[in-house]
A protein has these predicted regions:
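Cytosolic covalent-transfer regions centered on His/Cys nucleophiles
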Residues: 1-195
Length: 195
C-alpha cells in the first residue's frame, strides 16, 4: 500500500520508534488531507508537492565537475541559502553528517538526497537539485551525479514531495530522465507530468 511504501522510505532516513503511530498519522494525512482543507478556519497551508518545491531557481545543471563532494553539496544548496530557506549552519551540519556518520542517503543509482534535521537551521520547506556532468565520490562511500538537497522545518511538510520524488525515480526511471533532460525547463516539465 501507499502507506507501507512511505514507511519504507522513511526507514531509510532515520529510526522509526513508533511504527503504528506513524502509520496512523500517514493514513490520516493521505486520506483526510482534502477533507481537512475544507474545515472552516483551517489556515494550514497545503503540503507542497515536488513541483511546488523544485522551481527553476532550485534546479541547476552544471558542465564542470566541482573539486570535491563538499563543493558539490554547497553548490546544490546555494539557491536555498540565497532564498532564505536554510541558514548557513544547515549546510555545515549536512556536510558534517555525511563526513562523520556516512548515512545511507542514496535514493536511486547515482542520486543522493542530503538533508539535516528540522532544528538544524531550516527556515521553511525547500528542495534543490544539482546535476553534475559525471559522478563524484562522496565521502568515500557513495558515487553520485545527481544531488538533491532537502530542507524542512516541519516533520510532515516534505513528505508529499519526497514520496513523489521516490515514485518518479522508482517507476519512471527518474535518474535517467534527469540525466537526459536537455535543460532545466524540460526537467521541470517532466516532474510536472509525472507528479
Amino acid at each position: 500500500s501507499q502507506i507501507e511504501q512511505l514507511l519504507l522510505i522513511f526507514e531509510r532516513f532515520g529510526n522509526i520508534t513508533d511504527h503504528k503511530g506513524l502509520q496512523h498519522a500517514l493514513a490520516n494525512y493521505i486520506y483526510d488531507e482534502s477533507s481537512a482543507a475544507n474545515v472552516v478556519g483551517n489556515i494550514e497551508p497545503p503540503t507542497p508537492s515536488l513541483t511546488d518545491l523544485l522551481h527553476r531557481e532550485h534546479v541547476q545543471f552544471i558542465t564542470s565537475l566541482p573539486g570535491s563532494w563538499q563543493q558539490a553539496i554547497t553548490q546544490a544548496s546555494a539557491s536555498l541559502l540565497k532564498s532564505g530557506v536554510i541558514e548557513p549552519r544547515y549546510l555545515q551540519i549536512m556536510l558534517d553528517k555525511i563526513a562523520d556518520e556516512q548515512p545511507y542517503i542514496m535514493l536511486a543509482e547515482g542520486v543522493i538526497i542530503a538533508h539535516a534535521g528540522v532544528d538544524d537551521g531550516a527556515l521553511e520547506t525547500g528542495m534543490a537539485l544539482l546535476r553534475l556532468p559525471s559522478k563524484i565520490d562522496v565521502a568515500g562511500y557513495m558515487q553520485a551525479d545527481i544531488i538533491i538537497v532537502l530542507a524542512t522545518n516541519n516533520p510532515q511538510k516534505h513528505l508529499k514531495a519526497l514520496a513523489q520524488l521516490n515514485e518518479f525515480l522508482e517507476f519512471y526511471d527518474g535518474g535517467n530522465v534527469i540525466r537526459r533532460a536537455p535543460d532545466e525547463y524540460v526537467l521541470i516539465k517532466d516532474f510536472a507530468r509525472h507528479s
